[in-house]
Design a protein with these regions (language model features):
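Extracytoplasmic/peripheral linker and loop segments enriched in polar/acidic and small residues
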Residues: 1, 30-42, 96-111, 136-204
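Append "and occasionally in soluble cytosolic enzymes with long acidic Gly/Pro-rich linkers
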Residues: 1-92
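Extracellular/periplasmic catalytic domains that process cell-envelope and extracellular macromolecules
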Residues: 61-64, 115-118, 201-203
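Loop/turn elements at helix/coil->beta-strand transitions in domains of secreted/extracellular proteins
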Residues: 64-67, 95-99, 118-122
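Active-site-proximal beta-strand/loop segments in catalytic clefts of secreted hydrolases
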Residues: 71-75, 104-106, 125-128
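Flexible loop/turn segments at secondary-structure boundaries
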Residues: 76-80, 109-112, 130-135
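Short helices/loops that flank or line small-molecule/ion binding pockets
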Residues: 84-92, 108-121
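Ligand-binding clamshell of periplasmic/extracellular solute-binding protein-like
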Residues: 122-138
């Protein structure tokens, strides 16, 4: 599945038939997908940013490679096989000198054994949309709602010691709330949500 957005494709359309994630891609300044070339793929820029990141973070005391922890259910061979594919993708994409995926396991409860203890570097999760509106997705990442499951349960940004990260989440939350307040013009609502979503993706 080719996807440059956080909101799923095919969920929302503007009055002229434009699919919502196309608005997000436009806000990100990405060209239209031609069915072959990944629009965010820029190997030269990646190598430049990688070298810059290694230099800056090494000066801050970070050692490389960085190890990203990913958890699967113990005894679930399908999950382990998928994780190994992901590990290889990390290796092929980042290089083993930059970011390495470490696969770990939990026994019975990923929430109790991993998420609540903040042991994960990232998590792969998702669900089918409950209703056809960007709030269904973006509302999960705001910093001002107990209903923001992914922010509260997985992201933990509100608990971060980084003022910069907290400020970015506050800006994102403000954009989402402004979009959610538009109820009399659905095209304007979707445009505002696309702005918020692009902001989130630009700062991921």
């Amino acid at each position: 599945c080719y996807n440059n957005s956080y909101t799923m494709q095919g969920l929302i359309y503007t009055s002229d038939g434009t699919e919502y994630t196309e608005l997000v891609q436009e806000k990100l300044g990405l060209p239209s997908y031609d069915g072959e070339t990944m629009t965010r793929l820029d190997s030269a820029k990646f190598e430049e940013y990688k070298a810059q990141a290694i230099e800056e973070l090494t000066a801050e005391g970070v050692t490389f490679p960085i190890h990203a922890r990913y958890f699967v259910a113990s005894g679930n061979q399908t999950a382990l096989d998928s994780a190994n594919v992901l590990k290889q993708a990390f290796s092929d994409s980042f290089g083993d000198d930059f970011i390495v995926l470490d696969i770990d396991s939990y026994v019975s409860s990923v929430s109790k054994e991993v998420y609540n203890l903040k042991r994960q570097s990232f998590a792969i999760a998702g669900w089918g949309a409950d209703y056809g509106d960007p709030q269904n997705y973006l509302g999960q990442e705001t910093d001002d709602s107990d209903n923001a499951y992914y922010m509260v349960q997985l992201g933990h940004a509100v608990d971060s010691e980084s003022d910069e990260l907290k400020d970015l989440y506050s800006q994102f939350t403000e954009l989402v709330n402004k979009a959610d307040a538009i109820t009399d013009d659905m095209d304007a609502r979707y445009e505002a949500y696309a702005e918020a979503e692009a902001f989130m993706l630009d700062h991921a």
